[in-house]
Amino acid sequence: QLGEHAKKYPAQLSGGQRQRIAIARALIAQPKVLLMDEPFSALDALTRENLQNTVLDLCEQQQLTLVIVTHSIEEAIFLGQKIAVFSDHSGTLRHIGENRHSGQANYRGTAEFYEHCNLLRSWIGGQVHEN
C-alpha cells in the first residue's frame, strides 16, 4: 500500500508512515515475537490508535506474540494481555496483571477501561484520576 509514497525519502514521510514501514521491515523476517519499544510515542492520538489496531490485527493474522515497552498507561491497558510494571531503578518486577479485554475496539473509553488505567496508576505509584 505504498502507492504515491513508494519513491519518497524517509524524511518526506509522516511519523505514522515511517512507523508503518518500520513495522513492515520487522515483519519481513517472519518473527514469532514482535518486540516494540515506545513505537507510538511520537504520533498524534488518532494515528496512534490506528497503528495500535493495525499491529494487533497483524499479530493475530501472523500469530505473533507482541512485547511492547511503553510509558503510556492507556496504551498498556489497550494493548496488553499481560501488563508488567518494573521498578524505576533496579528493574525488578513490581506487579503483573492480566487484562482480558485487551485489543477490543469497544474497550477504549469504557468505565472498565478507566478503572484498569487507575489500577495501573496505583501499581506505578501515580495519582489515581477520578472519572
Where are these regions (language model features)?
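Conserved signature/switch motifs of ABC ATPase nucleotide-binding domains
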Residues: K8-A11, A29
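ABC transporter NBD signature
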Residues: S14
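Catalytic Walker B motif of ABC-type/P-loop ATPase nucleotide-binding domains
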Residues: L34-D37
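Helical segment within the ABC ATPase nucleotide-binding domain
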Residues: R48-Q62
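Conserved ABC ATPase "signature" region
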Residues: Q1-E4, D57
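Hydrophobic anchor residue at the start of the ABC signature
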Residues: I23
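Conserved beta-strand-loop-alpha-helix hinge in the C-terminal portion
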Residues: D88-L119
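Conserved H-loop
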Residues: Q63-V69
